[in-house]
A protein has these predicted regions:
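Cofactor-binding loop segments of dinucleotide-utilizing enzymes, especially the Rossmann-like FAD-
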Residues: 13-15, 44, 121-124
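A short, Lys/Arg-enriched amphipathic alpha-helix followed by its capping loop at the start of a domain
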Residues: 28-37
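Glycine-rich phosphate/pyrophosphate-binding loop and the adjoining helix
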Residues: 33, 140-180
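A short beta-strand-loop structural module common to alpha/beta enzyme folds
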Residues: 37-48
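Single conserved hydrophobic/aromatic residue that forms the stacking wall/gate
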Residues: 1-13
Length: 180
């Protein structure tokens, strides 16, 4: 019913430097979400974003003072109704590229309050491994701080580059999540 009233602007921030399982996951999600939503993709691995220096100047200037892709990227994120984060597991955490984008959101963090969000994580260990829990907890903390409505957190096990393409159950689940 919500879709009949208003199209949602969904922002998918996905890091898939290898163009493998995370890309497959977000493609399945998008397939479900495409009807009735405007979807944009942010690909951190293709952006030039310097690490946050913690200088605090952004609080005076209402944006990052770095002359890179930060402010344009954060503008996109702030304008979204829903943000979907998708990442491979790197050393028990999200990818450095995604973390860097999230860190740079500090410059406009309060404008992210109340967003609908979702999380898709793909790793090379079974989904009961601690690595997924650590990432979920980090996103839970962000969601709590920013009053996010965390709609879903999904983890998938895929070791070889195209493993997720063979997992029809996971692809169907992601498509169904996207269509909600």
């Amino acid at each position: 019913l919500h879709r009949l009233i208003r199209r949602q602007r969904q922002m998918c921030i996905r890091d898939s430097a290898r163009k493998g399982n995370v890309l497959t996951a977000i493609d399945a999600f998008q397939k479900g979400a495409a009807a009735g939503n405007d979807i944009e993709i942010i690909q951190p691995e293709q952006l030039h974003i310097a690490p946050c220096k913690g200088c605090g100047a952004c609080q005076c200037y209402k944006g990052c003072v770095d002359k890179d892709d930060t402010n344009a990227t954060i503008d996109q994120i702030v304008s979204a109704d829903m943000i979907v984060f998708a990442t491979p597991v790197y050393w028990w955490g999200m990818s450095a590229q995604l973390k860097q984008v999230i860190d740079k959101c500090y410059c406009r963090g309060m404008q992210l309050k109340g967003k609908k969000t979702g999380l898709i994580v793909v790793g090379g260990s079974p989904v009961d491994n601690i690595q997924y829990e650590l990432i979920r907890k980090q996103f839970d903390c962000m969601a709590d701080y920013l009053s996010w409505d965390m709609l879903f957190q999904k983890s998938y096990y895929a070791t070889a580059r195209d493993d997720l393409q063979k997992n029809m159950e996971a692809l169907e689940e992601l498509e169904n999540i996207g269509s909600c």
